[in-house]
């Protein structure tokens, strides 16, 4: 379904998963913050820890398991909610600010979108097909303005969804101020 985008608000999303393949891996954590066109958060957002299947947890490779152990996420999974409940919470949060057509935003957002599409189809249905991927802007800065790229904020989120969302917003704000400043 193609819905018209909401012109000013951006729906920032980050997911933590058991791996990168939505056909076999599952969601562990989802964070969403809605901002206005000036990248100012409308509120604190929503962060949900999801309870994955024991099969998905057991299939995590060592690198991913270590990453989620160090971040503390694995310790929180016992208090996670079913993905259906997480979907309802995320949808309720988004529709508080954007009825339909929210532009999904974040870093390397295509992977997050695949997981949202598979595990949260009701959320996917209210998002526009367009996306703002900060990592694409970063790649342009690397090639066209390395001096600007070198001044970009360092990421410290430690693979936790809300920290990653907030860092992505800050990173786009940096590129907006320093890189996307031309006039026509």
From Swiss-Prot:
Domain Exonuclease: 10-172
SUPFAM superfamilies attached to this UniProt entry: Ribonuclease H-like
Annotated Pfam families: RNase_T
EC numbers for this chain: 3.1.15.-
GO molecular function terms listed in the Swiss-Prot or TrEMBL record: 3'-5'-RNA exonuclease activity; nucleic acid binding
Key words of the record: Cytoplasm, Exonuclease, Hydrolase, Nuclease
Active site per database record: 129
Protein localization: Cytoplasm
Claim: Magnesium is one of the keywords in the record: no
Entry annotated with the keyword Nuclease: yes
Family affiliation: Belongs to the oligoribonuclease family.
Task of the protein: 3'-to-5' exoribonuclease specific for small oligoribonucleotides.
PANTHER family registered for this protein in UniProt: OLIGORIBONUCLEASE, MITOCHONDRIAL
Name this polypeptide is given: Oligoribonuclease
The species this protein was found in: Tropheryma whipplei (strain Twist)
């Amino acid at each position: 379904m193609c819905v018209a985008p909401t012109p000013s608000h951006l729906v920032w999303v980050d997911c933590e998963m058991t791996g990168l393949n939505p056909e076999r891996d599952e969601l562990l954590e989802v964070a969403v913050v809605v901002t206005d066109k000036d990248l100012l958060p409308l509120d604190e957002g929503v962060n949900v820890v999801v309870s994955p299947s024991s099969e998905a947890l057991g299939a995590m490779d060592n690198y991913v398991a270590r990453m989620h152990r160090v971040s503390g996420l694995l310790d929180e999974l016992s208090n996670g909610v079913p993905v259906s409940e997480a979907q309802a919470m995320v949808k309720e949060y988004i529709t508080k600010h954007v009825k339909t057509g929210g532009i999904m935003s974040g870093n390397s957002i295509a992977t997050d979108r695949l997981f949202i599409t598979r595990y949260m189809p009701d959320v996917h249905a209210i998002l526009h097909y367009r996306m703002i991927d900060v990592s694409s802007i970063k790649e342009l800065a690397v090639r066209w303005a390395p001096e600007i790229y070198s001044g970009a904020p360092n990421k410290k989120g430690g693979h936790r969804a809300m920290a990653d969302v907030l860092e992505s917003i800050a990173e786009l704000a940096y590129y907006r101020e320093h890189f996307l400043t031309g006039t026509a």
